[in-house]
Amino acid sequence: MASATIKVTQTRSTIGILEKHKATMRGLGLRRIGHTVELEDTPAVRGMVNKVNYLVRVEGE
């Protein structure tokens, strides 16, 4: 059985945000506005998404 996944899309620019949040975006694999990645739905990924929730949109919850 495949594990659950979520789609995360970057909706805002990373210019002018905290360096920690930029690192989190890189950790999620997001590079530019409109970029979408499919990630496993784990507590670690959810924590990263919650940290930068003002920059991303999540689908498949």
UniProtKB/Swiss-Prot annotation:
Keyword set includes Ribosomal protein: yes
Annotated GO MF terms: structural constituent of ribosome
Keywords, sorted A to Z: Ribonucleoprotein, Ribosomal protein
InterPro entries linked: Ribo_uL30_ferredoxin-like_sf, Ribosomal_uL30_bac-type, Ribosomal_uL30_CS, Ribosomal_uL30_ferredoxin-like
A biological process from GO: translation
Keyword Methyltransferase in annotation: no
GO CC annotation terms, alphabetical: cytosolic large ribosomal subunit
NCBIfam families found in the cross-reference section: rpmD_bact (TIGR01308)
Subunit structure: Part of the 50S ribosomal subunit.
HAMAP family documented for this protein: Ribosomal_uL30_B
Family recorded in the similarity comment: Belongs to the universal ribosomal protein uL30 family.
Name of the molecule in the record: Large ribosomal subunit protein uL30
Originating organism: Chromohalobacter salexigens (strain ATCC BAA-138 / DSM 3043 / CIP 106854 / NCIMB 13768 / 1H11)
